[in-house]
């Protein structure tokens, strides 16, 4: 190395290790990258938080909008009912009879449906079709993963491939479309219960045999005739290429069952207003009440029809008889459940609830409504159960209620019945434009109109002919024509049709049922008054009041009789009074005793059930054996002895009091106040004109069975004849 090189001390440092500033550069670069990454993460986190906040805000806005639409939809129906009520008042004031309130409610529903369909904007871009070829069936609940978030969807029904692009996009129309279960669980129970609770038992039981024949046999005949005719129509539609999906024979029978449910509410309202013949009213009302129950059980039995083998829609004898057994089981089970749950009279009998009318009315309401839900929960039919619950409540529980609760319960269910029925008919008009799955088939609709006409004719005329063979008071041709004309369809047929609209066949049935209801309510209902005049059916028939009946002269009449049969001479000692009034020519004739099973039931009800369940009837200490004395004293209420004021049920029950009736069992005579004496087995009615009530009404109210009057064997009712002087 040269000497000059040693004189440069910095040259060795430059060529050896790097300078310290260069060493800091990677550190500064790493630190900068970390700061940049942190800043980027912070900004992305803030963006995510902002996005989440925006999603929550959008969700809250959707919930608020949904709540607003719910309020608007309910307000729409309330305004419909309000407008209907005001128009009804105007019609009644002007005595307009060509249009009933139910038809009016349907018209208003149609108008609102048109406004909602064509006057409210649709919301687009919120529906999307997704394909899932890995599954071979639909699920009731579906969880969908959208960007890591799971959303729950529920099944609403099947949509045909041709209508995928026409799915309803209007949220408002979706809001006014109710779940069908709302009709069954909320709206139908008060309608059916009111029919049973307000039943006029006098005329109903006087025509009970005919009513049962029309309701059971007639509905079955109508169902099978309509079903077979519609099956022919379906075959014709297949030949003509007018049927785009499956439509089986069981579907036709199901349609026959639901469309056989009559609802002559318009006709009955006009009958009641014009005071038409009471027997005709009883036949139509009784048939419609029981007919609804039969139709719903019959439809359930048809749905349960499952033949063995691959072809599940072919006829199979074993499956047929199994369906018949299901029909009998469901109907009898529902009847039993309704009657048993309706016998809650002991709750009102052995408690002091009558001191608190509000609690008494509330308990009565809840126990009555729970009958429907209990029957449905147990696999029976709530319609049948709540119907017979209403009849049982009216026969037993009503007598135990306080005066205020009686008025409250009748008015409560009357108001609920009115509102529910008009709500359903308003919804019918609305559904013509808001329902999303209508299937209009002209051939099917025309065939259905022809089928229900022929089914009604085969229902009324042949049965009336056979019934007249055993009836003393024949069902005249004018009555038969009026019953044929009065086969309106209404709330029950609509509720059964809308309950299942998942398949193509059921959607076609629903649309056709809706049009049939419109036609029968508007056209047939509007023609009721002219038809009454054309058929020369009596109107303005006023039932004799109790005071008028008390003026009649009384004479002996046989107990436990069938008013429809001719009387052979008989020396039986069962007798009650028959009035010598305007119908004395008919009433004075002796009549043959009814079947022994009815006599046993009447006697059992009067002597045991009424005293056990109500404050009515003879004390159990006089009807039960001596060894049951303790039980009899426990079940007999003090009101049986010391009740000074008669508790009356309108047109059904009568609770005996002192001065009205003295009951004799064996050698012991027991008056209503509990006093007794020993004499022969007789029963005497006492009191002056001030305290005397119609003897026919007494027994009729006590038994709740109308003109079929019964007394237990070995007991006579002795009534003093009034002096003609």
From Swiss-Prot:
Spans annotated as Disordered: 1-20, 567-590, 669-714
Gene assigned in the entry: SLC9A7
GO cellular component: Golgi membrane; intracellular membrane-bounded organelle; membrane; plasma membrane; recycling endosome; recycling endosome membrane; trans-Golgi network
Glycosylation sites: 145
Protein name from the UniProt record: Sodium/hydrogen exchanger 7
Primary location group: Golgi
Membrane topology (UniProt): Multi-pass membrane protein
Residue numbers of Phosphoserine PTMs: 545
InterPro entries: Cation/H_exchanger_CPA1 (IPR018422), Cation/H_exchanger_TM (IPR006153), NaH_exchanger (IPR004709), NHE-6/7/9 (IPR002090)
Gene3D superfamilies: 6.10.140.1330
Species annotation: Homo sapiens
Function of the protein: Golgi Na(+), K(+)/(H+) antiporter. Mediates the electoneutral influx of Na(+) or K(+) in exchange for H(+). May contribute to the regulation of Golgi apparatus volume and pH.
Gene Ontology MF annotations: potassium:proton antiporter activity; sodium:proton antiporter activity
NCBIfam families: b_cpa1 (TIGR00840)
Modification after translation: N-glycosylated.
Cytoplasmic side of membrane: 1-21, 92-95, 197-210, 273-277, 344-349, 392-414, 464-474, 535-725
Superkingdom per UniProt: Eukaryota
Family listed: Belongs to the monovalent cation:proton antiporter 1 (CPA1) transporter (TC 2.A.36) family.
Region (Required for trans-Golgi network localization), start-end ranges: 533-559, 563-568
Membrane-side (Lumenal) residue stretches: 43-70, 117-175, 232-251, 299-322, 436-442, 498-513
């Amino acid at each position: 190395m040269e000497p000059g090189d040693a004189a440069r001390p910095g040259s060795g440092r430059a060529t050896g290790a790097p300078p310290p500033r260069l060493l800091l550069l990677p550190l500064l670069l790493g630190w900068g990258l970390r700061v940049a990454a942190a800043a980027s993460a912070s900004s992305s986190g803030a963006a995510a938080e902002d996005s989440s906040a925006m999603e929550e805000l959008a969700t809250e806005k959707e919930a608020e909008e949904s709540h607003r639409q719910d309020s608007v939809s309910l307000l729409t129906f309330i305004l419909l009912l309000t407008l209907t009520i005001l128009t009804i008042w105007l019609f009644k004031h002007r005595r307009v009879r060509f249009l009933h309130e139910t038809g009016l409610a349907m018209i208003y529903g149609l108008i609102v449906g048109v406004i909602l369909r064509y006057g409210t904007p649709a919301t687009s871009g919120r529906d999307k079709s997704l394909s899932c070829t890995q599954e071979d069936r639909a699920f009731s609940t579906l969880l969908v993963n959208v960007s890591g978030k799971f959303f729950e969807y529920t099944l609403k029904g099947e949509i045909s491939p041709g209508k995928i692009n026409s799915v309803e996009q209007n949220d408002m129309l979706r809001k006014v479309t109710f779940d069908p279960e709302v009709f069954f669980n909320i709206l139908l129970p008060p309608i059916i219960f009111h029919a049973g609770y307000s039943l006029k038992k006098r005329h109903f039981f006087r025509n009970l045999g005919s009513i049962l024949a029309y309701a059971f046999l007639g509905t079955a005949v109508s169902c099978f005739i309509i079903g077979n005719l519609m099956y022919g129509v379906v075959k014709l539609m297949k030949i003509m290429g007018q049927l785009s999906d499956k439509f089986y024979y069981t579907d036709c029978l199901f349609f026959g069952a639901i469309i056989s449910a009559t609802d002559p509410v318009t006709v009955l309202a006009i009958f009641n207003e014009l005071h038409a013949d009471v027997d005709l009213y009883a036949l139509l009302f009784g048939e419609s009440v029981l007919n609804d129950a039969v139709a719903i059980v019959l439809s359930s039995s048809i749905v349960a029809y499952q033949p063995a083998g691959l072809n599940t829609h072919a006829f199979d004898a074993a499956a047929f008889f199994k369906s018949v057994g299901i029909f009998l089981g469901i109907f009898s089970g529902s009847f039993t459940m309704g009657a048993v749950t309706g016998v809650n009279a002991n709750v009102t009998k052995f408690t002091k609830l009558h001191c608190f009318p509000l609690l008494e009315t509330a308990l009565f309401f809840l126990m009555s409504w729970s009958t429907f839900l209990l029957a449905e929960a147990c696999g029976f039919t709530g319609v049948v159960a709540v119907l017979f619950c209403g009849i049982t409540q009216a026969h037993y529980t009503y007598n135990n209620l306080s005066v205020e609760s009686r008025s409250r319960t009748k008015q409560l269910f009357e108001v609920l019945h009115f509102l529910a029925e008009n709500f359903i008919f308003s919804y019918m008009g609305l559904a013509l434009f808001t329902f999303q799955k209508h299937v209009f088939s002209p051939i099917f609709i025309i065939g259905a109109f022809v089928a229900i006409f022929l089914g009604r004719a085969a229902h009324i005329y042949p049965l009336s002919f056979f019934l007249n063979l055993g009836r003393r008071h024949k069902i005249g041709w004018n009555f038969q024509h009026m019953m044929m004309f009065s086969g309106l369809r209404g709330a029950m047929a609509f509720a059964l049709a809308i309950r299942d609209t998942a398949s193509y066949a059921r959607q076609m049935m629903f649309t056709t049922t809706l049009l049939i209801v419109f036609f029968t309510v508007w056209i047939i209902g509007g023609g009721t008054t002219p038809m009454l005049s054309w058929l020369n059916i009596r109107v303005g028939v006023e039932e004799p009041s109790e005071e008028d009946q008390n003026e009649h002269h009384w004479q002996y009449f046989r107990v436990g009789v069938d008013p429809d049969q001719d009387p052979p001479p008989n020396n039986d000692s069962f007798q009650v009074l028959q009035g010598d009034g305007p119908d004395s020519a008919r009433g004075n004739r002796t009549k043959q005793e009814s079947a022994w099973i009815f006599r046993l039931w009447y006697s059992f009800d009067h002597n045991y059930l009424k005293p056990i369940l109500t404050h009515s009837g003879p004390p159990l200490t006089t009807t039960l054996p001596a060894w049951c004395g303790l039980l009899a004293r426990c079940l007999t209420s003090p009101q049986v002895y010391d009740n000074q004021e008669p508790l009356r049920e309108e047109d059904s029950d009568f609770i005996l009091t002192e001065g009205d009736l003295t009951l004799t069992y064996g050698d012991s005579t027991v008056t209503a106040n509990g006093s007794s004496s020993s004499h022969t087995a007789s029963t005497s009615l006492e009191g002056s004109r001030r305290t005397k009530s119609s003897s026919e009404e007494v027994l009729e109210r006590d038994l709740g069975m109308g003109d079929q009057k019964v007394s237990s064997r070995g007991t006579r009712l002795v009534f003093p004849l009034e002096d003609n002087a």
